[in-house]
């Protein structure tokens, strides 16, 4: 039997993080292209424009906006209507002076937080991988797939603040006590906590972090947080 590649998702099968009704647009909804974000933390740009922002009535209008360079993601025009726009990405429509950052609300749903033009030049992420390369350098990989070279000063799970579209690092946030962290899974999803302790566990279990959120102290897996700067607002 031939194998067919599905171009759409059943609307009932969309991730629970997507802020669209599970029966929206009938039986099917646009499936995201492969990208650095998992489906849990990203939606196709067409869904953001049509179903969330209401800037298009149909896919024809979505394609018009994209093909005419009216929509930017992280400062660059996007043509692919299935392009995944995910956590911390910056979605911009300069023609109408609208700028947004993808975040999670306290229900665990993705949403677009309105930001100003200056803030749209900044992005947040986390180091998820580090490997040695030629020349004695270390290559670091961030949550959105970007990479940079450096010495061995940083560790995985450190937060990073950088400029877009020209990738320039502004700050690296260590994973340490009293640093702020953005929570992406669990009871306090979408909120900012203060790190109280990082608890190392035996392999293969991930490490645990103890956080204080709104006066309440709790624990979660280290993979569920991203260190952020002091001025970060959810």
Curated annotation (Swiss-Prot):
The gene is rps4e. Residues 43-106 form the S4 RNA-binding domain. It comes from Nanoarchaeum equitans (strain Kin4-M). Belongs to the eukaryotic ribosomal protein eS4 family. Keywords: Ribonucleoprotein, Ribosomal protein, RNA-binding, rRNA-binding. It comes from the Archaea. GO terms for cellular component: cytosolic small ribosomal subunit. InterPro entries: KOW, Rib_uL2_dom2, Ribosomal_eS4, Ribosomal_eS4_central_region, Ribosomal_eS4_central_sf, Ribosomal_eS4_KOW, Ribosomal_eS4_N, S4_RNA-bd. It holds the Pfam family RS4NT. This is Small ribosomal subunit protein eS4. GO terms for molecular function: rRNA binding; structural constituent of ribosome.
